[in-house]
């Protein structure tokens, strides 16, 4: 019992020191002011495309309070064509990863269009990754990592999110990947 009390006192003392420390507060403010996802995209050589128009009766994004919901999007290339095919037969895991990464770039373009300034992203909350895959394919997370790795590279800690990575028997237009997402914004 004495050991528990000593540990609690030590933890309380440490938290009081860190809470009252102006250096700790400044460090937090520095991290916030250094957050510049658009500069990060530039440094990575990524140029955001113009968001594509929805192909049916829906919109690319809907804001509800401080949440922005993005519709499912796919790996649309600069030439206007999608990366298509099934991972496990037509595409390798690496090609699927690149399709998911491209889908992430397209989703960031929609974020930019909706928000004007990507530094308004407070947190990527959730992504649902759907992989067009053969029935025996089991590496869906490795494919959707293309999206998740990009979000963390661009948004840092704010890019870490919850996620589903599932296989589908087919996707619209035979696209390789479709990903939708929920984002908390400022």
Protein language model features and the residues they cover:
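Bacterial N-terminal signal peptides that target proteins for export
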Residues: 1-8
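C-terminal motif of bacterial Sec signal peptides marking the signal peptidase cleavage site
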Residues: 15-18
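Short, polar/acidic, helix-capping and beta-turn segments at strand->helix junctions
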Residues: 20-186
